[in-house]
């Protein structure tokens, strides 16, 4: 079955017949102006890159997806589980330059139109939430810390409609080649889901983990119907021609931008 993330210029766009007024996807590393190592489509202002490159990439993306930069919102992510509701007053936050607005925020949601929620990724899991019926969109950033902190639950706790009307898309992230040690594994053991469904022990102090699967299980446990959750097969750590991977490239890499707008 074909993946619902469809490759287009600069992006992978999620396509589904249920989507009418919502657009969501993630940028790729292709056809840009940045190093990492060359011609990369980096979207992060907080790494070693020309600010002019980022602005140009934003302008290119705005043209592709039909959301002007003035409608974008970008938080300063810190691998925590803080969730913030955004409104039209937040338009343009951290787009032209970074400031302290929305600092320490790893999930956003809104019920308002003409907003594009955005965050940067390079292995962590982008998790998109939407309900066309309720004019709701959300976006979460879940690395291992955010997963342990149950950021998906933190976002869902703000929803005031029936979860049967919520759809969740789990986007490109690191593959099951990602490994954690005993100490980190012990943190996952505190979660209310079956650890054997997403962690496998591979040796002394070595455990493979499927972060996409872990977040899907947390969503199900929180009451989101399994049929309403989609998990892409794309893996950032397995295709460096398409994605940046912080772990594989040992931190010397760019960032993709996940986005969802209505």
From Swiss-Prot:
Residues reported in the UniProt entry to bind Zn(2+): 79, 124, 141
Reactions that this protein is recorded to catalyse: adenosine + phosphate = alpha-D-ribose 1-phosphate + adenine; S-methyl-5'-thioadenosine + phosphate = 5-(methylsulfanyl)-alpha-D-ribose 1-phosphate + adenine; inosine + phosphate = alpha-D-ribose 1-phosphate + hypoxanthine; adenosine + H2O + H(+) = inosine + NH4(+)
Cofactor: Cu(2+); Zn(2+)
Pfam families: Cu-oxidase_4 (PF02578)
Residue stretches spanning the membrane: none
InterPro entries recorded: Cu_polyphenol_OxRdtase, Cu_polyphenol_OxRdtase_sf, Cytotoxic_necrot_fac-like_cat
Keywords, alphabetical: Copper, Hydrolase, Metal-binding, Oxidoreductase, Transferase, Zinc
Assigned EC number: 2.4.2.1, 3.5.4.4, 2.4.2.28
GO molecular function terms noted in the UniProt entry: adenosine deaminase activity; copper ion binding; oxidoreductase activity; S-methyl-5-thioadenosine phosphorylase activity
Biological function: Purine nucleoside enzyme that catalyzes the phosphorolysis of adenosine and inosine nucleosides, yielding D-ribose 1-phosphate and the respective free bases, adenine and hypoxanthine. Also catalyzes the phosphorolysis of S-methyl-5'-thioadenosine into adenine and S-methyl-5-thio-alpha-D-ribose 1-phosphate. Also has adenosine deaminase activity.
Family: Belongs to the purine nucleoside phosphorylase YfiH/LACC1 family.
Assembly behavior: Homodimer.
Protein name (record): Purine nucleoside phosphorylase SSP1584
Lineage of the species this protein comes from: Bacteria, Bacillati, Bacillota, Bacilli, Bacillales
